[in-house]
Design a protein with these regions (language model features):
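Extreme N-terminal tail/first-helix region
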Residues: 1-16
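Glycine-enriched loop-and-adjacent helix/strand subsegments that border the catalytic/binding cleft
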Residues: 16-29, 33-114
Length: 114
């Protein structure tokens, strides 16, 4: 099968202390989960969190000690950012009991959400 355009490579992130990289297929996000930040954004802080996805190719890997660069529209007047706890899911599942959830976690990281 021929493609109309070339597929982008699978996004991945380095794993500290390992040669292998962790493939990123989906980025699940939780919004309005921090009350003080919700208030900064004009909400009361009592609204429930909401869930959404970001595409895996939105990922920008910045190696330790390096400075990252991210393109954004030149007329941007308020580029917002948040530090995030990243939870890398190692194994999938359904109807996972809370007591078993941690068994599905591959690892943790710090992320910068723009």
């Amino acid at each position: 099968m021929s493609l109309v355009f070339q597929l982008a490579p699978q996004p991945s992130v380095p794993v500290l202390g390992q040669a292998e990289k962790f493939p990123v297929r989906r980025i699940y996000c939780v919004g309005r989960n921090y009350e003080e930040h919700a208030k900064e954004m004009g909400f009361t802080g009592r609204e429930p969190p909401f869930f959404f996805l970001k595409p895996a190719d939105a990922l920008v890997v910045v190696n330790e000690g390096a400075t990252g660069e991210m393109a954004y529209p030149s007329l941007t007047q308020n580029l917002h950012h948040e530090i995030e706890l990243v939870v890398a899911i190692g194994t999938g599942g359904r109807n996972i009991k809370a007591a078993d959830a941690e068994k599905h976690i591959y690892g943790y990281a710090v992320g910068l959400d723009m």
